[in-house]
Each structure stands twice: as C-alpha cells, then as structure tokens.
C-alpha cells in the first residue's frame, strides 16, 4: 500500500519532468493511474472494514478489547520466556500503559480499555471514510472511470487523502502490534530494497530524469518512515487520563 503510493508519486514526478517520456502515452498513463487508484482504494477499504466477518484493523482491535483480560502483566512480561521478576523494560512499559506504580505491581494487572479506544479513534477520520466512499463509486462505476481521461492534477486531492488514511492505518497497526500485543516494532515503514528501484527506468525517461526521480523518492520515503514516531507517547497520554 505505502510502497505502491510512493512508486506512483515518483513515476508521476518523472513523467512531469520529461515531456517526451513514453509515460505520457494515453494507454499507459490511464492504466497506471487507474491501477493505482483501484489498489489504494481497495486496500484502505479492506484494512478499515468494520464488519465482523473480515480480517481488518477494526476487527483486530475489537478482538483485543474483548480479550484484554488475557493480556495480564504476567503474560505481557513473560511471553518471550523472560522471568517475571525484575525491573526491566516490559514491566516499565506495562506500568506506563496501565497507569500503575512500580511498587504496586500485580501479576493480574491489565491494560485499560481506553488505550484500545484511543487506537480505534485514530481510524475514525474523514479521510478514511472519503477514500472508502470513493472506492465504492470507483468499483460500482468502473466503466465511467475508464472512459475519462486521466488528470494527475485533478486527483492530487485524492492522493492527499490516501496518504492521510495510510498514516492513520500505519500508526494504529504499530500501536496495537508493538505496544499492546508486544510484538516487534517497525524500524521503517518503507522496506529497504536489495536491488535498484530504477533499473531500466531510462527506457521511459531520460537519464537525468532517472537521477531526479531517485532523489524525489527519498522525500516521501523519509516522511512515511516517520509516521510511527510519537505513537507510544500518544498511548501514554491516554493512560495518564
């Protein structure tokens, strides 16, 4: 989802820098843009689906909230095989999330529901609803969209909403995974490729534009990799209320 978005933005940037590029071919431009919009709309729609018969973030958060009784301090601290005794990081983190003092620790301490409520609220934003609504219309009236010419300027607002929706999803996923379920945290949102992202891209644009596109990629990549900053602090502010 995130990589697809950065890829589209970078290719669109490269096309804008090279007016003679084959990327301006109407068929290529239309197929690439419609593929991007359909993929983003469907992915965000699926990840934020609130129904109970699907796999999504809202479904996961509801399941976590209804089973918080199972995530006790003892389970949280010792699930990796570490001994329960000791004043190490898992204990301190649980203290902070549960709002308890270190001298009053109990094995059956639990994380309050309001922490999960906060994560759910991060998904309750207009941008997600608007992208989901737009996705419904895109799929229901696909033929109409296919007949329309592609105007990147016209969809820039939609791209901004897609980025906002992605950010909310990433932050919610990081919060529940790394801090509630005590799974590994993400060091980066965008994966580090072990190959050249722009291999043979000079077949579509000039070599100068390839170099510019490579630099352009770094900006949204850095921005997305910072999306998880402050997630834990936001949860702690909830625990303190």
Question: What function would you assign to each model-found segment?
Answer:
Residues 1-126, 152-241:
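Amphipathic alpha-helical interface segments
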Residues 122-148:
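Histidine-centered, metal-coordinating catalytic motifs and their short helical/loop contexts
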């Amino acid at each position: 989802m995130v990589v697809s978005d950065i890829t589209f933005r970078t290719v669109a940037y490269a096309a804008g820098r090279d007016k003679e590029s084959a990327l301006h071919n109407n068929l290529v431009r239309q197929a690439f843009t419609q593929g991007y919009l359909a993929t983003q709309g469907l992915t965000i729609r699926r990840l934020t689906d609130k129904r109970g018969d699907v796999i999504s973030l809202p479904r996961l958060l509801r399941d976590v909230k209804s089973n918080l009784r199972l995530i006790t301090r003892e389970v949280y601290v010792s699930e990796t095989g570490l001994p329960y005794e000791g004043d190490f990081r898992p204990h301190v983190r649980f203290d902070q999330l549960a709002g308890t003092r270190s001298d009053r620790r109990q094995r059956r301490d639990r994380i309050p529901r309001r922490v999960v409520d906060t994560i759910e609220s991060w998904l309750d934003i207009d941008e997600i609803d608007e992208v989901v609504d737009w996705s419904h219309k895109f799929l229901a009236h696909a033929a109409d969209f296919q007949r329309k010419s592609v105007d990147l300027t016209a969809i820039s607002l939609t791209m901004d909403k897609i980025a906002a929706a992605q950010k909310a999803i990433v932050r919610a996923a990081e919060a529940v995974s790394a801090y509630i379920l005590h799974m590994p945290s993400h060091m980066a949102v965008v994966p580090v490729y072990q190959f050249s992202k722009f291999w043979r891209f000079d077949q579509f644009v000039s070599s100068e534009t390839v170099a510019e596109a490579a630099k352009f990629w770094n900006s949204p990549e850095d921005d997305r990799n910072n999306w998880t900053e402050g997630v834990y602090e936001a949860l702690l502010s909830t625990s303190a209320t």
